[in-house]
Amino acid sequence: MIALIQRVSEAAVRVDGEVVGEIDTGLLVLLGVEKDDDEAKAKRLMERVTTYRVFEDDEGKMNLNVKQVNGKVLVVSQFTLPADTKKGTRAGFSRGAHPADAERLYDYFSDLCEQELPTERGRFAADMKVSLINDGPVTFWLQV
């Protein structure tokens, strides 16, 4: 399971022109679910995402996590993250989970996040338009 996390000052996701999720200070989490992922991996990744220190302390060091800054999380499904891009000029998607499994684990991950801090989410498998202001920019690839 993969989370591409971005520290944002704001982020929103729209479906058919309607805002379905929106946050101010926090993390935009693009979530990719792989074939062998399960609830244990989702829980471990949620713990990493919500405790990963990407926000600056009083000394300017990235020493604080999203919970410590009273931030929020916006979780957006991103089926292209597990893609195989090692060869050629077209990505292969065989490493991604079956859509039904991916949706179940995406919902599970998002539900776990909601238990920890304010969480918004995109709409699984929808054509989404994601806007953000990346603060830094600060972006990390987390994988379990």
UniProtKB/Swiss-Prot annotation:
One record GO biological process: D-amino acid catabolic process
A single GO cellular-component term on record: cytoplasm
Where is this protein localized, as stated in its record? Answer: Cytoplasm
The record, for InterPro entries, names: Daa-tRNA_deacyls_DTD, DTD-like_sf
Name the Gene3D superfamilies on file.
D-tyrosyl-tRNA(Tyr) deacylase
Query: What SUPFAM superfamilies does the entry give?
Result: DTD-like (SSF69500)
Q: Which domain of life is it from?
A: Bacteria
Give the residue ranges of motif Gly-cisPro motif, important for rejection of L-amino acids: 136-137
Which top EC class is named for this enzyme in its record?
hydrolase
Write out the GO MF terms: D-tyrosyl-tRNA(Tyr) deacylase activity; Gly-tRNA(Ala) deacylase activity; Ser(Gly)-tRNA(Ala) hydrolase activity; tRNA binding
Q: Has keyword Iron-sulfur?
A: no
- Keywords (A to Z) from UniProt: Cytoplasm, Hydrolase, RNA-binding, tRNA-binding
Q: Which reaction does it catalyse?
A: glycyl-tRNA(Ala) + H2O = tRNA(Ala) + glycine + H(+); a D-aminoacyl-tRNA + H2O = a tRNA + a D-alpha-amino acid + H(+)
| Enzyme nomenclature, EC number | 3.1.1.96
Q: Does the keyword Methyltransferase apply?
A: no
As for family, the record states: Belongs to the DTD family.
- Describe the protein's quaternary organization and the partners it interacts with: Homodimer.
Please give the function described in this protein's UniProt entry. Answer: An aminoacyl-tRNA editing enzyme that deacylates mischarged D-aminoacyl-tRNAs. Also deacylates mischarged glycyl-tRNA(Ala), protecting cells against glycine mischarging by AlaRS. Acts via tRNA-based rather than protein-based catalysis; rejects L-amino acids rather than detecting D-amino acids in the active site. By recycling D-aminoacyl-tRNA to D-amino acids and free tRNA molecules, this enzyme counteracts the toxicity associated with the formation of D-aminoacyl-tRNA entities in vivo and helps enforce protein L-homochirality.
Q: What does the entry's domain section say?
A: A Gly-cisPro motif from one monomer fits into the active site of the other monomer to allow specific chiral rejection of L-amino acids.
Put simply, this protein is called D-aminoacyl-tRNA deacylase
